[in-house]
Amino acid sequence: MENDVKENLEEEEDRLLPPPPPSQSLPSTDSESEAAFETNEKILIVDFESPDDPTTGDTPPPFSWRKLWLFTGPGFLMSIAFLDPGNLEGDLQAGAIAGYSLLWLLMWATAMGLLIQMLSARVGVATGRHLAELCRDEYPTWARYVLWSMAELALIGADIQEVIGSAIAIQILSRGFLPLWAGVVITASDCFLFLFLENYGVRKLEAVFAVLIATMGLSFAWMFGETKPSGKELMIGILLPRLSSKTIRQAVGVVGCVIMPHNVFLHSALVQSRKIDPKRKSRVQEALNYYLIESSVALFISFMINLFVTTVFAKGFYGTEKANNIGLVNAGQYLQEKFGGGLLPILYIWGIGLLAAGQSSTITGTYAGQFIMGGFLNLRLKKWMRAVITRSCAIVPTMIVAIVFNTSEASLDVLNEWLNVLQSVQIPFALLPLLTLVSKEEIMGDFKIGPILQRIAWTVAALVMIINGYLLLDFFVSEVDGFLFGVTVCVWTTAYIAFIVYLISHSNFFPSPWSSSSIELPKRVSVSNS
């Protein structure tokens, strides 16, 4: 009798205890998929409201500055993609060739980027899963692997630009002593060093990014103050939309650099670093409100930094012979020749800002790579192992590029054009799954976006894809030469368009018999007001 009672008590204990973590050696299933952040890694959101007045139902708790501080972090990590070396090159070329005339477009492109990133955050907060994980369940196996491949290609392309940007900055700051390939090695090593900080908590890593963003802000603000661009022209450029046939390519570059495919995946994972109860509707809405404030502030800062760079080069090189030749490699030298030394030579100020941009973006790129690979493939690997794999995928081609193009500025510019094309090609494969998922009630529950926001989001997505399509068409018309190359491009273009049509047809926005009904996700339970 005593044994029976003992066994019953043990069984009851087992039911009350949380399940043990799945073994690393066992094959993973959907129910065992690895979370973006473990429970002990998440930041606890403390309630500062009075315990006598608990918030229930649909109404979020009142605004709290202390709680906003707890939510601050993911938006600033997300904003790094708006400040990477590729964006800085787009800024300097826009300023040198178009002057102040595209500042209005930079502002509205940043606003469009904020909308897309908030949809990504919405998916992460409302479902408790990030975009790559949801894509794994939403699409059939063949489509999932295509999406994963495209995301990895986009990430590698962005990483090459970011690492090369850091390497150029290191070359500038070492006065040419360190070659480009040495800068690549240093950047790769630094990245692992910074990622090590994650073991000491998410807040430590976020603090490092805050320092890097502050470094960029101070460096480029110093350049802005030293060069004294025209305040009148700056305000006209922001408030008066202007676009000429001579600046269309730069305009396309400004918009195209704002939406980074890997950043859409990244933000949906970063917001899960805060411990939020997804079953309480008021808490989910509260988190979305704070993330909107935080992301808006972060992207306003990124807009100001991009504005500083654009106006500095507009002041120095607009209307000059050097305008069409300026790029990331020679920008520092041109600045030095134009504006000279001062207390701290502008060449080194530019180098410090560029280094901060390159270092921060390579770290977020590695971070995004872990979520993309882990989410799509559901790999049961330790974080450092995933970091090694994803970092190697980018560092190896970057090292080859650095060795081959070490002394050729023209070749690096051509390579950068091809990398921009690669990024543009991948944009639909992040935007379309995001818009599909955020519009589905069975996934989002009460946080599915409404018809008006759906139309706005699809309009923005269509605009971004059309603009990038123009960039692709313009590039291939000027670069594609030879019958075999032309046929290859046509074949790949046909397959590319067919897959985009499939993704669009899979969404709820455009009902189609192509939409898969065989893949069913567990319906998200809506939270009642009681």
Swiss-Prot record:
TM annotation in the entry: 68-88, 96-116, 153-173, 177-197, 205-225, 251-271, 297-317, 339-359, 395-415, 418-438, 456-476, 484-504
Q: Which UniProt keywords apply?
A: Ion transport, Iron, Iron transport, Membrane, Transmembrane, Transmembrane helix, Transport
- Has the keyword Oxidoreductase been applied to this entry? no
Is Secreted included in the keywords of this UniProt record? Answer: no
* Main location, first listed in the record: membrane
Identify a single GO molecular function assigned to this protein: manganese ion transmembrane transporter activity
Q: What GO terms fall under cellular component here?
A: membrane; trans-Golgi network
Give the function comment from the record: Seems to be involved in iron uptake.
Stated name of the protein: Metal transporter Nramp2
Annotated source species: Arabidopsis thaliana
